[in-house]
Amino acid sequence: MKKQLRSSFSTQGRRMAGARALWAANGMKKEQLGKPIIAIVNSFTQFVPGHVHLHEIGQLVKKEIEKLGCFAAEFNTIAIDDGIAMGHDGMLYSLPSRDIIADSVEYMVNAHKADAMVCISNCDKITPGMLMAAMRLNIPTVFVSGGPMEAGELDGQHLDLIDAMIKSADESVSDEEVSKIENRACPTCGCCSGMFTANSMNCLNEAIGLALPGNGTIVATHANRTQLFKDAAKLIVENTYKYYRDGDESVLPRSIATREAFLNAMTLDIAMGGSTNTVLHLLAIAHEAEANFKMDDIDMLSRKSPCLCKVAPNTQKYHIQDVNRAGGIMGIMGQLAKAGLIDTSVVRIDGMTLGEAIDKYDITSPNVCEEAIKKYKSAAAGKFNLVLGSQDVYYKELDTDRAEGCIRDIEHAYSKDGGLAVLKGNIAQDGCVVKTAGVDESIWKFTGPAKVFDSQEAACNGILGGKVVSGDVVVITHEGPKGGPGMQEMLYPTSYIKSRHLGKECALITDGRFSGGTSGLSIGHISPEAAAGGNIGKIKDGDIIEINIPERTINVRLTDEELAARPMTPVTRERYVPKSLKAYASMVSSADKGAVRLID
């Protein structure tokens, strides 16, 4: 059944003369009146290398849409660079910005009654924020990311942002060497080159079904990234007419992002050792979609999904550009499908089922198309470059080695245990998360005395000051969604542990979270958090912490009676919390529920 255009409320009828006059002042031509209005939700900013190249691409998408007869209007969202906001109180704003982005998209699209939208996202909180908005609005939507940064190179070795952070804190590394690394770590526009949060989310968007193949892995500088934007423009027009003219609801975000799609996305995340932040974001997006996807589902999937792909920071051998050469996300999904670990019947924005898309785009499929071959041969150029789509270098050959290549088959998995795990115990009754793909198997079982800090800053000072020694478990409390507030990323503490050469000799646990760039025995999202009365807030220096990844447990060696009788450890830090973050803290849920705002 034909649907009424939402935009007709501002373009049709005598009483809308004023609105039509304003639309005309926005550039709408008379022949475009009554045609679908498609919002272009851009996230261009000159604060973030993952977004610095998006200035003109929104207008390219607008031109492509308007060639096909619709009217397109662009607006921007905020975007925070977690790497620049890291290590100071700017990080308190990062996770809350996800909800601000979701709200701003909802406000703009509903206020102006747009009929559909193209979301141009890229970095950490922007993609999930836009996805949350898409679930709320439930209008035809296509996502296309700005693409990953090329990996840096020094002395024939790949490097990235995390190398710069670790080496700069290592006193044995000279200033000259640090300068060399700093100047080569981030050579192009795009989101940082490892399987960090931004790239993880852009890859998962392919699995959810709201982005086209190649969205997560074709580098930002390649011409085929520009082609993705053109393809997205064409597709959003097709899907807009499918919904409003033909009444086809299969193109709507909630029809695509079902429980099964979230299970597929999480299975992919586990298989590729993605960022632990994706757990927060998938839970939050599913909450907005009203899909029945919970922390227990993640625990269940982590016990049966193997690790099929290892990328920085879990290894320095491969970066996202190498995943693309190995067939991208469809390459990983193809191996998961062969093992029966994903539901291939789910639908996608391109009208195919996931199974049909795998058959067409998995480079090991006998039916792989030429378009797929071209996408996945898209290579890094190896030059400093801040311009989207400005190079067309191609690999001579694809990486189809599923035994020893970047992407493995089930038989040759990096580990039978997946790349992420949910642990529970008496200091995490509602769960916590560890990226097992980044943990050396020699410390999957770890027991040690606690060194407790009530802030990230105190932990950094303690680690660099020599208070943390081999065998310790660093415990950082009151950094959860409420306690921070804002649930800071603990990338600097984990980097400093590595800079002290303790990466395989210490653990770190927190009710805060970690950057996608974190590796090592780093356990976050402990729920309930200290600020909500969680037992992590009762741990004292010297308490023995027991971590067992194979058994999925984490405990402090105290009886239930001892824990119940012990008071919360007083918070000694001094931290100014502005009203905006106090408002966030008053509404936010625990990490095991995605740190969503709880609003009746």
From Swiss-Prot:
Cofactor annotation comment: Binds 1 [2Fe-2S] cluster per subunit. This cluster acts as a Lewis acid cofactor.
Q: Which GO terms describe its molecular function?
A: 2 iron, 2 sulfur cluster binding; dihydroxy-acid dehydratase activity; magnesium ion binding
Query: Which reactions appear under catalytic activity for this entry?
Result: (2R)-2,3-dihydroxy-3-methylbutanoate = 3-methyl-2-oxobutanoate + H2O; (2R,3R)-2,3-dihydroxy-3-methylpentanoate = (S)-3-methyl-2-oxopentanoate + H2O
GO-annotated cellular components: cytosol
Keyword vocabulary terms for this entry? 2Fe-2S, Amino-acid biosynthesis, Branched-chain amino acid biosynthesis, Iron, Iron-sulfur, Lyase, Magnesium, Metal-binding
Q: In which pathway does it act?
A: Amino-acid biosynthesis; L-isoleucine biosynthesis; L-isoleucine from 2-oxobutanoate: step 3/4; Amino-acid biosynthesis; L-valine biosynthesis; L-valine from pyruvate: step 3/4
Read off the Pfam families from this record. ILV_EDD_C, ILVD_EDD_N
State the top-level EC class.
lyase
EC numbers, comma separated: 4.2.1.9
The record's annotation in SUPFAM superfamilies points to: IlvD/EDD N-terminal domain-like, LeuD/IlvD-like
Q: List the catalytic residues.
A: S515
Residue sites binding [2Fe-2S] cluster per the record: C123, C192
List the cofactors: [2Fe-2S] cluster; Mg(2+)
Query: What biological process terms from GO does the record include?
Result: isoleucine biosynthetic process; L-valine biosynthetic process
Q: So where does Mg(2+) get bound?
A: D82, D124, K125, E489
Residues annotated as carrying N6-carboxylysine in the record are K125
- Similarity field: Belongs to the IlvD/Edd family.
Describe, as the record does, how this protein assembles with itself and its partners: Homodimer.
The job of this chain, per UniProt, is described as:
Functions in the biosynthesis of branched-chain amino acids. Catalyzes the dehydration of (2R,3R)-2,3-dihydroxy-3-methylpentanoate (2,3-dihydroxy-3-methylvalerate) into 2-oxo-3-methylpentanoate (2-oxo-3-methylvalerate) and of (2R)-2,3-dihydroxy-3-methylbutanoate (2,3-dihydroxyisovalerate) into 2-oxo-3-methylbutanoate (2-oxoisovalerate), the penultimate precursor to L-isoleucine and L-valine, respectively.
The protein's name in its UniProt record: Dihydroxy-acid dehydratase
Originating organism: Bacteroides fragilis (strain ATCC 25285 / DSM 2151 / CCUG 4856 / JCM 11019 / LMG 10263 / NCTC 9343 / Onslow / VPI 2553 / EN-2)
Q: Which gene encodes it?
A: ilvD
